[in-house]
């Protein structure tokens, strides 16, 4: 990542303002409340604009552009509007109107965002105000095209916890009871030579040598060999992930790959067959043969059962989300809402992903069969299926820390292409690699949390802040496509982790109804009747759609929890004071208060 200082546009910097205060989230604010700033964030320019609000019409305001955000504050006395948009959220910037435009507010900029909203600003035609704002926004929203660093490498925030220590692969596998006499940890990929998109540490069958792994890698797309993701604590069945076999049109076979899958199958003595879930529709899997890919045939893999899960590819998901945006922003058409939502097929895709994950979880838990999961390259649909199945099977992943580990492990370390799918700092908004695969996963988690309201330690805000910073480029957590790229860029040394922000203020993200249950398997109902559009995420920018507020019972429960904590604190203070009095030598007959025993509480 090239590093460069801020450019000539620094002339409007607010650095000379001497009086600042720091809010609880670490954001510096000057006393005039002009614009919030993070440590390392600098103001580039500010301009007077007309914000074309799709809900309330034109609003006169001042827009501030920093190296991290676009911040608009209304200048009108009857409007308190504020827009706070991280530049990483911006997907496209276009000029609207030309030199001959005569319509009111017809000359300015159109900004398309990745988080389901668009922005439109009208500017004066004289003084090159549009050109200046366009160039500055383009430069800092798409820094990779201008040899500038992503803001995460400039962010100087400090937190009292280090989110980079959340996930340690050795500790996580040890929690699962690994290694054991069937599975071993290998460092064959420590320099990312076996597979450059896999993590350095892998768990593989004990009976498979490193040379076996190298031979298997030649027959799997991108060298992404079958490796263990999760082992059942009781029946010892496993979830294994990989990419498609390189069968091709001629139906090539690889004895090493076939033997390797047999070794995986033999780690489980309860069932005679290994279950393979191919996430793709069968027609797509067949079509992949033309490009050298394919699937495990019955002829070659006698001891395996293959099932196709009919989950569509990244291009279908991208178009589906575009249709969702069309119906939720800026206006929601009530009269045709249900038919419009159905036409997007978004919930249908959510249903298919959840259904596939349920099959994986059920086969492992109830069917007592080990499972191998793959799609084409094993970093999109595969990650969705393994992580959701693990969330259903393992209650640890339903805690805040456990979910962070799940994301770090199954998505980040195993090479989901965040940079390509999100387009961090990249101006090529038409890139065919863009796709909302991780958003879809988080949506599935939200659907599960609605069906099991006491099963998850985290609340909806936890999921939303993860999605917001998926785009923001404020943290290093989701940057780059794989672990090897993050190592080269020293991401853990040079950037801050999103988990640092979350774990320094966990109470904000806790579900008050959470009940910790060990070994409870969740089987959500993946029917269209039980799935719903996540209004608080997809339609949150529309002020006419009332946000779903916590119900009175939840609010009262949270108040009681706060009251309990306050009473416990007071009680501890009284006990400390009483202990101090009892330890002092009495100078007079004991008073009733000195004789008071420690009070026990049922809280």
Curated annotation (Swiss-Prot):
Outcome of mutating residue 404 to K: In CNMX; mild
InterPro entries assigned: GRAM, Myotubularin, Myotubularin-like_Pase_dom, PH-like_dom_sf, Prot-tyrosine_phosphatase-like, Tyr_Pase_AS, Tyr_Pase_cat, Tyr_Pase_dom
Binding site for a 1,2-diacyl-sn-glycero-3-phospho-(1D-myo-inositol-3-phosphate): 288, 313-314, 376-381, 421
Effect on the protein of changing residue 69 to C: In CNMX; mild; reduced response to PI5P and reduced binding to PI(3,5)P2; abolishes interaction with MTMR12
SMART domains to which the protein is assigned, alphabetical: GRAM, PTPc_motif
Protein location: Cytoplasm; Cell membrane; Cell projection, Filopodium; Cell projection, Ruffle
Annotated catalysed reactions: a 1,2-diacyl-sn-glycero-3-phospho-(1D-myo-inositol-3-phosphate) + H2O = a 1,2-diacyl-sn-glycero-3-phospho-(1D-myo-inositol) + phosphate; a 1,2-diacyl-sn-glycero-3-phospho-(1D-myo-inositol-3,5-bisphosphate) + H2O = a 1,2-diacyl-sn-glycero-3-phospho-(1D-myo-inositol-5-phosphate) + phosphate; 1,2-dioctanoyl-sn-glycero-3-phospho-(1-D-myo-inositol-3-phosphate) + H2O = 1,2-dioctanoyl-sn-glycero-3-phospho-(1D-myo-inositol) + phosphate; 1,2-dioctanoyl-sn-glycero-3-phospho-(1D-myo-inositol-3,5-bisphosphate) + H2O = 1,2-dioctanoyl-sn-glycero-3-phospho-(1D-myo-inositol-5-phosphate) + phosphate
Protein name as annotated: Myotubularin
Protein encoded by which gene: MTM1
């Amino acid at each position: 990542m090239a590093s460069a200082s801020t450019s000539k546009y620094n002339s409007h910097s607010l650095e000379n303002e001497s009086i600042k205060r720091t809010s609880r989230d670490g954001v510096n604010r000057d006393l005039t409340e002009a614009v919030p700033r993070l440590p390392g964030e600098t103001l580039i320019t500010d301009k007077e604009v007309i914000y074309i609000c799709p809900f309330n019409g034109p609003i006169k305001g001042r827009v501030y552009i920093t190296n991290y955000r676009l911040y608009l504050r209304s200048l009108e006395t009857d409007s308190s509007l504020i827009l706070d948009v991280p530049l990483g959220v911006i997907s496209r910037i276009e000029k609207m109107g030309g030199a001959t435009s005569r319509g009111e507010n017809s000359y300015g900029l159109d900004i398309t965002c990745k988080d389901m909203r668009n922005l439109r600003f009208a500017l004066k035609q004289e003084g090159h105000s549009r050109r200046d704002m366009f160039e500055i926004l383009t430069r800092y929203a798409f820094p990779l095209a201008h040899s500038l660093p992503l803001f995460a490498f400039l962010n100087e925030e400090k937190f009292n916890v280090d989110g980079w220590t959340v996930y340690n692969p050795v500790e996580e596998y040890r929690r699962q009871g690994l290694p054991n006499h069937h599975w071993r940890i290998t460092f064959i990929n420590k320099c990312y030579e076996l597979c450059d998109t896999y993590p350095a540490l892998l768990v593989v069958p004990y009976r498979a040598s490193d040379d076996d792994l190298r031979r298997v890698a030649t027959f799997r797309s991108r060298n992404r060999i079958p490796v263990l993701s999760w082992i059942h604590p009781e029946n010892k069945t496993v979830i294994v992930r990989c990419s498609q076999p390189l069968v091709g049109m001629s139906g090539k076979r690889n004895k090493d790959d076939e033997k390797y899958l047999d070794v995986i199958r033999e780690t489980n003595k309860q069932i005679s067959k290994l279950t393979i879930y191919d996430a793709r529709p069968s027609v797509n899997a067949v079509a992949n043969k033309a490009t050298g890919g394919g699937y495990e045939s019955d002829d070659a893999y006698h001891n395996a059962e293959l099932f196709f899960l009919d989950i569509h590819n990244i291009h279908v998901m991208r178009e589906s989300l575009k249709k969702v945006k069309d119906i939720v922003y800026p206006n929601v058409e009530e009269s045709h809402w249900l038919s419009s939502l159905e036409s997007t097929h978004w919930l249908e895709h959510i249903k298919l992903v959840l259904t596939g994950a349920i099959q994986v979880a059920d086969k492992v838990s109830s069917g007592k069969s080990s499972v191998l999961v793959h799609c084409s390259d094993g970093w999109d649909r595969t990650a969705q299926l393994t992580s959701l199945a693990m969330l259903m099977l393992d209650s640890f992943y339903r805690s805040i820390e456990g979910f962070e580990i799940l994301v770090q492990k199954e998505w980040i370390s195993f090479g989901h292409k965040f940079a390509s799918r999100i387009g961090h700092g990249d101006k090529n908004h038409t890139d065919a690699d863009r796709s909302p695969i991780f958003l879809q996963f988080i949506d599935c988690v939200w659907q599960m949390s609605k069906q099991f309201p006491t099963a998850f330690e985290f609340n909806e805000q936890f999921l939303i802040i993860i999605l917001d910073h998926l785009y923001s480029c404020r943290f290093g957590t989701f940057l780059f496509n794989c672990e090897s790229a993050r190592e080269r860029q020293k991401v853990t040394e040079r950037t801050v982790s999103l988990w640092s922000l979350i774990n320094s203020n966990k109470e904000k993200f806790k579900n008050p109804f959470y009940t910790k249950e060990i070994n409870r398997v969740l089987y959500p109902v993946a029917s269209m009747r039980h799935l719903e559009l996540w209004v608080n995420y997809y339609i949150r920018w529309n002020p006419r759609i009332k946000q779903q507020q916590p119900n009175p019972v939840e609010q009262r429960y949270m108040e009681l929890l706060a009251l309990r904590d306050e009473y416990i604190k007071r009680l501890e203070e009284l006990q400390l004071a009483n202990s101090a009095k009892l330890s002092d030598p009495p100078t007079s007959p004991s008073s009733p208060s000195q004789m008071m025993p420690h009070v026990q509480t049922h809280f």
